[in-house]
Amino acid sequence: MIYLNKYRHITEEAEKSLYSLVKDLINKNTTNILEVGTMAGQVTVILAGAAAEKNESVNVISIDQNYDTFSPTAAESLQANNLFNCSFESDKLEERFEENIIKANIIYIDRFHDKIGSKMELIKKNAIVPTKVIYRNPKASSNFPFEVTEVSPQVKPRQRKKSTENTKAATKVSAK
């Protein structure tokens, strides 16, 4: 993988690990991978590469806020890798994240480290298909930096209509 930005926030070993993990998680029902990142593009390239290799129809939706205007963007790194299965959204990260949860089968959270608990609750509330959530745990990044959780939508059984019993005596009708 060609990654144009010099800033790397995960090691090469973690890159390989994430690449294989995502490839293993993608199945025939996977349509979108949602990534909330940091605009450097390292993880975006990994996710898009794994998705393209496993199933060309899987798209990556990357929600990022660009704080670094001097370094190459994720889009430039994707282009260098001939990966075009990615769309970008920026601005209003919280809103964009919530709006896109329903589109994703796999969610990678590389931002919101302090808010993982509240983000998981949001995902549980909004997921409409079984969703695998991968997030970085910076405190444990020396070993295996990723945690994976599966969230299944809460399907409530439909309430049956109460039948109203007719207690009146039925009137016989004869056919002539």
Question: Where does each model-flagged region fall?
Answer:
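S-adenosyl-L-methionine
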Residues: M1-L4, R8-H9
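S-adenosylmethionine/decaboxylated-SAM
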Residues: Y3, E15-K162, N166-K168
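Positively charged N-terminal leader segments that act as targeting/secretion signals
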Residues: A169-S174
